[in-house]
């Protein structure tokens, strides 16, 4: 068991830069970086230390409580291969599937024939359907807080690779190609983050 598992869980306080300024605080970029990493670490530790399904579900759905914009202010500018950057990408992925489950399913289904091994790693139903895809991304995020975090990241990476392949196949054009490439890049970052977590170096 790593040092991460021994630390006492703390409830993260989600004070974005704009919220801090609204309460009279001065904006400090260095402090913002510190807050980003501390909140990400606290969120993961709270879920993993609690070992409580109810806590896990609240953390999976935290965007529903505080809004994606709050997480964006906290985490979106952090490196992709950092804990806050990694969590940001996972929550964005979940939010996209929640907002466009039919599109996500169509692109995922189209990508399976190009990336069969990734489909197996992601663990989606076959054939995929919108409800199943939505459950899948929740299950992946749930693994961050109550399972093997590195495996959760590898599943998210595999899911992203399948969607990337499907999007490139069924949506020709430079914009879709760029989006597909971005998804592929995110998959590489998630895979790298999984390796870092296993090495105790994802902060």
Predicted regions mapped to residue ranges:
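N-terminal domain-start signal
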Residues: 1-87, 91-95
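Long, highly charged low-complexity segments enriched in Glu/Asp and Lys/Arg with interspersed Ser/Thr
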Residues: 14-17, 21, 34-37, 93-119, ...
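Long, charge-patterned amphipathic interaction tracts in eukaryotic proteins
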Residues: 31, 65, 69, 76-135
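Generic detector of well-ordered alpha-helical segments enriched in charged/polar residues
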Residues: 33-44, 56, 60, 72, ...
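Short, solvent-exposed segments of well-ordered alpha helices
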Residues: 53, 57, 80, 124-127, ...
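Long, hydrophobic, amphipathic alpha-helical segments used as structural scaffolds
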Residues: 70, 101-108, 141-144, 148-152, ...
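Conserved binding-pocket/active-site segment within a compact domain
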Residues: 113-175
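Glycine-rich, aromatic-bearing surface loops/beta-hairpins
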Residues: 161-203
